[in-house]
Swiss-Prot record:
This is Alpha-N-acetylgalactosaminide alpha-2,6-sialyltransferase 2. Highly expressed in lactating mammary gland and adult testis. Lower levels in kidney. It comes from Mus musculus (Mouse). GO terms for cellular component: Golgi membrane. The chain crosses the membrane at residues 7-27.
Length: 373
């Protein structure tokens, strides 16, 4: 082969070899090694504080969870010993056994069924017969690489003027509770509601107390789900009547028509019920207040907001908390929708100081993101 042809052949060979190397590098860059792949909640990248951004509707469910709270829990010595993400969050018929009845009959509500009618409990749970009733997001998750981002919106005055509405609505799911007024406050708190958490007592008290401020009905919507917190027999009776589409037959709410609160849809999939054992677990491990050992012990339970936020922390991959108590709570009104500033009052049935400390510590550990000003 003469010199020019030999030189040309070597140049072509060099180009082909270089192209192959580049192609291999490009291909490997688009793949993660087994050690860095993220299968849902349990294995993910370390949590970092994040500023929620609107998700891309086309690939939202296929994105990797790059800041999963589960790994942040694993990396924190204190919270690693407190969290048990395998704890059942919701109660449904499939979990209702004689053993469960015997156990929970030894504990007062909201931690059990002491003194409650077996027939009321059993007839309520029989209506929650689908496994879907035990899943907060409906059917069991089929996409292990999806990343569920949740916002839990409390009613704290810190949200007034916050302009967080768009960021709140950008989450996959939005939890609200009690007097969840959005009309007129869309810029600050958003409009999206995926879950509404309450006890019958807090729901009805909110409708009475905040009616003049704009809370004339609880959130309603086709894709909205209601999370009952079983603080008394009233919650079981209201839940049963809501699914059956009949008036409440007895108790303080006798004659109430649930559709006036929740709308005409009566499918069992519309309603969720927190497991009393889950509430016990949350109280024992995260919110074991000194109030329990005082004369107010029988009154004490975690606040509705605390239960919703901890529910999200046990079901979502990322959690942002808005409108929850912070160290500078005295700067703000009790609620964001109040026309005049009113101080936050600490009642004996909740330990808001303990809750504030917990939210701060979870934020500092990177397990949740707490909105602060």
């Amino acid at each position: 082969m003469d010199l020019p042809r030999r030189w040309l052949f070597r140049m072509l060979l060099l180009v082909a070899t270089s192209s192959g190397i580049l192609l291999m590098l490009y291909s490997s860059a688009g793949q993660q090694s087994p050690e860095t792949q993220v299968p849902a909640r349990n294995m993910a990248y370390p949590r970092a504080f994040f500023d929620p951004k609107p998700p891309n509707s086309e690939n939202r469910k296929s994105r990797l969870c790059q800041h999963s709270l589960s790994l942040a829990i694993q990396k924190d010595r204190r919270f690693r010993s407190l969290f048990d993400l395998s704890t059942p969050v919701l109660l449904w018929e499939g979990l209702f056994t004689q053993e469960l009845w015997n156990n929970l009959s030894q504990h007062k509500v909201p931690y059990g069924w002491q003194g409650l009618s077996h027939e009321v409990i059993a007839s309520t749970l029989r209506l929650l017969k689908s496994p879907e009733s035990g899943e907060l997001f409906g059917a069991p998750r089929k996409l292990p690489l999806s990343c569920i981002r949740c916002a839990v919106v409390g009613n704290g005055g810190i949200l007034n003027g916050s302009r967080q509405g768009q960021k709140i609505d950008a989450h996959d799911y939005v939890f609200r509770l009690n007097g969840a007024i959005t009309e007129g406050f869309e810029r600050d708190v958003g409009t999206k509601t995926s879950f509404y958490g309450f006890t019958v007592n807090t729901m009805k008290n909110s409708l009475i107390s905040y009616a003049k401020l704009g809370f004339t009905s609880v959130p309603q919507g086709q894709n909205l789900r209601y999370i009952f917190i079983p603080s008394s027999i009233r919650d079981y009776l209201m839940l049963r009547s809501a699914i059956l589409g009949v008036p409440v037959p007895e108790g303080p709410d006798k004659g109430d028509r649930p559709h006036t609160y929740f709308g005409p849809e009566t499918s069992a999939s519309k309603f969720k019920l927190l497991h009393p054992d889950f509430i016990s677990y949350l109280t024992e491990r995260f919110l074991k207040s000194k109030l329990i050992n005082t004369r107010f012990g029988d009154m004490y339970m975690p606040s509705t907001g605390a239960l919703m936020l901890l529910t999200a922390l046990h079901t979502c991959d990322q959690v942002s908390a808005y409108g929850f108590i912070t160290n500078n709570y005295q700067k703000y009104s009790d609620h964001y929708f109040e026309r005049e500033k009113k101080p936050l009052i600490f009642y004996a049935n909740h330990d808001l100081s303990l809750e504030a400390s917990l939210w701060r510590d979870l934020h500092n550990a990177g397990i949740l993101w707490l909105y602060q000003r």
